[in-house]
Design a protein with these regions (language model features):
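Beta-rich interaction/scaffold domains
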Residues: 3, 11-171
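Short conserved beta-strand and strand-loop elements enriched in small hydrophobics
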Residues: 7-10, 216-225, 317-321
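Regulatory N- and C-terminal appendages and interdomain linkers associated
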Residues: 51-55, 61-72, 165-234, 554, ...
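Extracellular/periplasmic catalytic domains that process cell-envelope and extracellular macromolecules
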Residues: 211-214, 227-232, 246-249, 265-268, ...
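Conserved oxyanion/phosphate-binding beta-strand-loop segments in alpha/beta enzyme cores
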Residues: 216-276, 399
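Zn2+-dependent metallopeptidase catalytic core
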Residues: 218-226, 287-307, 404, 408
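Middle-to-C-terminal accessory/interaction subdomains
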Residues: 248-249, 391-451, 455-457, 462-629
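Internal "kinase-insert"/substrate-recognition segments embedded within catalytic cores
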Residues: 256-262, 267-283, 295-300, 312-314, ...
Length: 629
């Protein structure tokens, strides 16, 4: 380019296009880069000389989606937490996107059908195109699975916009309840009905109570984050679940399919659970705890010399839940703990053996899933004599002989532990699974094995009593001790990183169903932890598992990315500040210590730090041989 040559320059901004022509004042040399400072004012002030022309670019001035124009795809309501610390649904008629420069974006958290008809306005005299197809506001359907380029044209001037309509990046579960079954109110609390709380009312619609008969004409569909179908619409029954948690405003649900279904890559089964995680500000405590259990399983499977541990633990995935046309936030969809070839693979439960009618049910050919829980609310149950541990059969055992044989075996184990005959106890108690379960409870800082609550054991025929699977980690686990103390936690609700939780146990003998809460047995662990055989087994298994468990930090950070967008919506719908929680759970003081962290990256860093501190604290306790105070 030589002196005197004409240079035509075009300058584009978000809203304007400027063009002018100027002469070259110097010779440009090849293979050189020239930086030329440019101020438009001088050219604009001498428009005739330089042929300066400024054009206002055609623009999209508003962009959104009307609910009526996208029926069956967009919900007409939004869950909000009001100033009275109660959830409510507000009416929604339109979703309005954000326009920033040449980018238009909006997040619809539950979106699973990306073919939508947008409503938009443009600058006067402009037309809008996607490719070569002219777009009509409120009429033209567009697939927003991927970002779409909208071109606005006015004469020979055009302006491109990139439109991104996304969800949270999680699968979307859609449930539609039928009208069949029992929706009558289930109440708790109050005095003579005054002040009672309806536990099966979900904000402003009803779900069936946990003890109602299953129906088979509810429907569930599951969509992947990209809108593809993971589970085509399947018949099922949905009802409330949980003990304490059923009274929380964000309702946990149980699902039973009419036919076995594979869900999100998990094996086919009829029984599934949707955990609400209302008290878990991070939304991932259950996810991380089950991942921890799987790492422990992986460790012993890769090191046969230390022996087998818990053979199966729950799998699941965080999802967005839509039920009866309401988006209710982030849930953990997971396998329910059940006996079966794809779950806890032991002999069939007594009821199933009897129902099959192929053989006579005996102690040896039945499997027994046992829950240890102070709620003590199953049909077949007993309390041990020395430590008052409540054992409940999850499946009815109608044969008194079999029931008494299982009870006698477990009581015999406790007798031997109580009398210091640990070798004899381990003839009937699987020490490997008991150690592994203890690792999980202690690492997650889960207070509930003290009571105990939601603790599972099992027996396969007349085999050993085994610990597991593990369950229920949403409340006050992975605790930031300092923050929890500042929130109001005290006593055994605080769990220092360098002490054993089971040191806080207060086992008592002779308790009954009416006063189980007077003691905290912590099952058999306060006695086991003093046994040299148990201590040696702990050290042996920990040496193999500790390096594997260090990798859990990466898993937590990965959740920090995958759950970040969902957190923005869920934390707004279900805040976990002190006032919000205590409005629905009087005098609650079992804090995790992250409830007031509003930045998800900071919350995840807190989670990682807490886990690292607890892992290191346990490593020091074990390697130094400190098992007693």
């Amino acid at each position: 380019m030589k002196t005197g040559d004409k240079i035509t320059i075009t300058v584009l901004t978000d809203k304007h296009k400027a063009e002018f022509t100027a002469p070259c004042l110097v010779d440009f040399e090849a293979e050189n880069i020239y930086n030329i400072p440019l101020t438009l004012k001088g050219f604009k002030d001498n428009a005739d000389k330089f042929g300066f022309k400024e054009t206002v670019l055609p623009a999209i001035t508003s962009f959104g989606f009307k609910v009526d124009g996208n029926k069956g795809k967009l919900l007409n309501n939004k869950l909000v937490w009001n100033s009275s610390n109660n959830p409510e649904f507000n009416n929604v008629t339109e979703y309005t996107a954000t326009i920033k420069g040449s980018t238009i974006s909006h997040i619809i958290p539950y979106l699973y059908d990306f073919k939508l008809k947008p409503t938009f306005t443009v600058s006067k005299g402009s037309k809008v195109y996607v490719g070569e197809v002219e777009q009509k506001s409120g009429e033209t359907e567009v697939d927003f699975t991927r970002p779409v380029t909208y071109t606005v044209k006015s004469g020979d001037v055009e302006h491109d916009y990139t439109v991104s309509i996304t969800n949270t990046g999680l699968p979307v579960v859609v449930i539609q309840q039928s009208q069949s079954g029992d929706f009558k109110e289930v109440t708790t609390g109050g005095l003579w009905g005054i002040g009672a709380k309806t536990v099966n009312k979900f904000v402003d619609f009803m779900v069936r109570g946990k003890d109602t008969e299953w129906v088979e004409d509810d429907q569930m569909t599951i969509y992947n984050a990209d809108g593809t179908v993971d589970l085509a619409t399947a018949n099922c029954g949905v009802r409330l679940r949980g003990n304490t948690s059923q009274a929380y405003p964000k309702k946990p649900l149980a699902v039973k399919f009419k036919d076995k279904q594979a869900v999100l890559g998990m094996p086919k089964h009829k029984r599934w659970v949707l955990l609400a995680n209302w008290l878990d500000h991070s939304m991932i405590r259950n996810s991380v705890a089950f991942d921890l259990a799987h790492l422990i399983e992986q460790a012993w499977k890769n090191n046969a010399s230390i022996g087998e541990g818990i053979p199966w633990n729950v799998h699941g995935q965080n999802v967005e839940l839509v039920i009866d046309g309401h988006h209710v936030g982030n849930y953990y969809l997971c396998e329910q703990i059940k006996i079966g070839s794809k779950r806890l693979d032991i002999n069939d439960a007594y009821e199933d053996v009897k129902a099959d009618g192929l053989v006579e049910a005996t102690l040896e050919n039945c499997g027994y899933l046992l829950e240890l829980d102070n709620n003590y609310d199953e049909n077949y149950k007993f309390i041990t004599s020395h430590y008052s541990v409540p054992f409940m059969f999850k499946d009815d055992v109608l044969d008194d002989g079999i029931f008494n044989q299982v009870k006698s075996k477990i009581q015999g184990i406790e007798d031997n532990i109580y009398n210091g005959n640990f070798t004899a106890a381990y003839n009937d108690l699987d020490i490997n699974s008991v150690v592994d379960q203890w690792f999980i409870w202690e690492l997650t800082m889960n207070h509930e094995f003290l009571d105990p609550r939601s603790v599972y054991y099992f027996m396969n025929g007349n085999g050993k009593l085994c610990a597991g699977p593990v369950w229920d980690f949403d409340r006050a686990t992975f605790q930031n001790v300092t923050n929890a103390k500042n929130q109001g936690s005290s006593g055994d609700r605080l769990k220092p990183y360098d002490e054993w939780i089971c040191w806080s146990a207060n086992p008592k003998s002779g308790l009954t169903s009416s006063n189980l809460d007077n003691g905290t047995s912590c099952i058999f662990y306060p006695a086991l932890i003093k046994d040299p055989i148990f201590q040696a087994k702990v050290k042996e298994r920990w040496a193999v598992m500790y390096p594997v468990l260090m990798g859990l930090e990466q898993t937590i950070r990965a959740y920090g990315k995958s759950q970040a967008v969902s957190f923005l919506f869920d934390s707004a719908m279900w805040p976990t500040n002190k006032a919000a929680i205590q409005k629905h759970k009087n005098n609650f003081s079992d804090w995790s210590g992250d409830e007031n962290i509003n930045s998800y990256p900071e919350l995840i860093e807190n989670f990682v730090t807490v886990y690292r501190n607890r892992l290191n604290g346990m490593n020091t306790l074990i390697t130094s041989g400190r098992f007693t105070k």
